Amino acid sequence: MAARVRRGPRQGRARGGPIALTATARLTIAGSSASIPRPDRACSSYLVDDGETPIVLDLGTGALANLRRYADYDRLSAVVISHMHADHFIDLIPLRYALRYGSRRRTSKLPVHLPPGGTAMLRTLVSAFASEGGEFLSDVFDLREYDPSAVLRIDGATLRFAHTAHYIPAFAVRWERDGASVTYSADTAPDERVVELARESDVFLCEATLRHGECEAGMRGHSTAVDAAEMARAAGVRRLVLTHYGEESTAMDLDESAREIFAGDIIVADDHRVLDL
């Protein structure tokens, strides 16, 4: 069965606000680039929304502007950060300003779920420029650190985590609700723990930072499209979405490389793409 995929709006929100979502769970790609944002692609960010509990997985460089086309920041249920590399969390800073000074105010603080040790790292970063100190974050965010070995429940959704093979502690995330599932690899080299987390997922968002045949010096912390396809095949997922790829890679090359390995639906991520789950 072909994946149900469509493009979101490119000209900003409708006059009355962001698009009204139905009860169908949807995955919206707000950022698909690797560490360098491009004119047409922000860094990593993904909105999973079942119409009741919109959850953002990562909020990388430039992604907030895209995200606002699909969900106002005052209605977000939570932000979950996979690891503390800037291209996965840095737009928490402009989000803080939006929550503090924007026209749409929340009635409660926004829960932000960070990996272990993430709170101290974020506060250290903020201390370099914010005179408010710790209050810069705590006045709008409810900062929490998840336990990667435990199940995180956010309203009706459940999230599970797995360690990945990356340069710093990083965690893949599996979102589930009412039989629908999305697994996000975060940044990782091929890893059996990620495969197990992704087992039989409806959608497997997997990074494809490296080009086929490209090697990293020292420890390997990223994957190729072939690696992603092999993990998708091993996990038995329905759809593979290749993401977190750089400007050197083309959609055609990524698709062709993965299609030699994985027989299911393959989508090369680009910003504003919306998938029904």
Please report, for each region that a protein language model flagged, where it lies by residue:
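Cap/insert and terminal regions of metallo-dependent hydrolase folds
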Residues: 189-275
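Active-site metal-binding motif and surrounding structural segment of the metallo-beta-lactamase
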Residues: 61-113
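Conserved beta-strand hairpin/beta-sheet module of binuclear metal-dependent hydrolase folds
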Residues: 19-71, 170-186, 203
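Divalent metal-coordination and catalytic microenvironments
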Residues: 27, 46, 58, 67, ...
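Catalytic core of the metallo-beta-lactamase
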Residues: 144-200
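Compositionally biased, low-complexity flexible segments
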Residues: 1-18
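Active-site neighborhood of phospho(di)ester-bond hydrolases with catalytic His/Asp-centered motifs
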Residues: 56-60, 77-84, 115, 183-186, ...
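Acidic/polar short surface loop at catalytic or gating sites that assists cofactor/ion binding
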Residues: 101-141
